[in-house]
Amino acid sequence: MEPQPGGARSCRRGAPGGACELGPAAEAAPMSLAIHSTTGTRYDLAVPPDETVEGLRKRLSQRLKVPKERLALLHKDTRLSSGKLQEFGVGDGSKLTLVPTVEAGLMSQASRPEQSVMQALESLTETQVSDFLSGRSPLTLALRVGDHMMFVQLQLAAQHAPLQHRHVLAAAAAAAAARGDPSIASPVSSPCRPVSSAARVPPVPTSPSPASPSPITAGSFRSHAASTTCPEQMDCSPTASSSASPGASTTSTPGASPAPRSRKPGAVIESFVNHAPGVFSGTFSGTLHPNCQDSSGRPRRDIGTILQILNDLLSATRHYQGMPPSLAQLRCHAQCSPASPAPDLAPRTTSCEKLTAAPSASLLQGQSQIRMCKPPGDRLRQTENRATRCKVERLQLLLQQKRLRRKARRDARGPYHWSPSRKAGRSDSSSSGGGGSPSEASGLGLDFEDSVWKPEVNPDIKSEFVVA
């Protein structure tokens, strides 16, 4: 007897009664489930026969973009808590009811942020995680911290671009020369000579802190798409690109400061810009923890690596040397510029030799003057003043709207409702003058034809009776 079409059932020769048994293709066939929500929506899912309840909730969480802790599944009035689906009698074509869970009461404030981060990361697909860690696409997360909602967008630097790598090395050498550190700037001056016009070093202003030419999107820690980095950028050595994690460190500022070779795992904020109250952006760089790296030194493709990057970024210390100046700082630089600026830093340069030839004494003097002109406390006070000003303006707007609504209600309840034609005629008659006192008539807002008071007396009665 030949096997039946489709290969779902296979029969053996010599079996009594031509008995057939299920083949491996039928055993591994996925089962189809119909998920019905309480709002009337239906979802069809194909899951393996040995799927667990936790795996099914994770699939629904990724599809609906809802944390799996907020999903509850029912099968014939039985809640699926844990274990395999077959243990609850779920088979091919079964109908499951999706019920959202409602939280009531108080929650632990200490466990909220971590749960929120994990819920946001668990809803990511493997493609999103891989694209983010390789620098192909940004990662956008919506996090809840206490009673506030926070949107975070991260972008790691792209890899495998030697020309852009030279640009980062030249920028690192420029920053090292601006700080007057010859031990770091001298070994990088030789590989920085063949910089092409496409990767030309940006013009360095007279102030020692170079400005960042790369655009930074508001509200996101995103590096510029044209800038790349690798861990050797921290050491200013252009060799061996696989010694540390390439996707963990990002930068988009040419003022990124080189760090020593024995750098501890963690992140450093290179630049930080406050665009508006509650809206920030900047760049960061760092080294991944060894537990998040594979044998070749590359970051592991899982959500644990992203969680480690987020934790390092939250615990990172502010790094002011690579911070792009704001408008207030640029005004302060113009006022507090040194008396004898370095002439070698004014024109556009394409090699590192001119940068290393700059005298370091005037640069250090300019740094001290800028720090005296713009202490860190003033920036914090400006942020607080801006936030207070926004709150006051919002309160004034709310009060103005409240006054307008109150006036509209008062006008609607008024005793006199004059038509526009009568008002126009009244204004014309009052302006033309004539008779007694037109100002009083216009002030009272009455017509000349209408009397102020009409006696409720029968007009047939004689006047003598009225007087008496």
Curated annotation (Swiss-Prot):
Biological process terms in GO annotation: negative regulation of glucokinase activity; negative regulation of insulin secretion; proteasomal ubiquitin-independent protein catabolic process
Annotated localization: Nucleus, Nucleolus; Nucleus; Cytoplasm, Cytosol
One of the record's GO cellular component terms: cytosol
InterPro entries associated with the record: Midnolin (IPR039336), Ubiquitin-like_dom (IPR000626), Ubiquitin-like_domsf (IPR029071)
Chain intervals with Low complexity compositional bias: 185-201, 237-260, 419-431
Chain intervals for the UniProt region annotation (Disordered): 182-264, 404-447
Family annotation (Pfam families): ubiquitin (PF00240)
Keywords carried by this UniProt record: Cytoplasm, Nucleus
Compositional bias (Pro residues): 202-213
Stretches assigned to the Ubiquitin-like domain: 31-105
CDD domains on file: Ubl_midnolin
MF terms (GO), sorted A to Z: kinase binding; molecular adaptor activity
Domain comment (free text): Contains three domains that function in concert to promote proteasomal degradation of bound substrates. Contains a ubiquitin-like domain (Ubl) toward its N-terminus that is necessary to promote substrate degradation. In the middle, two domains termed Catch1 and Catch2 are necessary and sufficient to interact with unstructured regions within substrates. The long C-terminal region associates with the proteasome.
Subunit structure comment from the entry: Interacts with GCK; the interaction occurs preferentially at low glucose levels. Interacts with the proteasome.
The protein's role, per its UniProt record: Facilitates the ubiquitin-independent proteasomal degradation of stimulus-induced transcription factors such as FOSB, EGR1, NR4A1, and IRF4 to the proteasome for degradation. Promotes also the degradation of other substrates such as CBX4. Plays a role in inhibiting the activity of glucokinase GCK and both glucose-induced and basal insulin secretion.
Full protein name: Midnolin
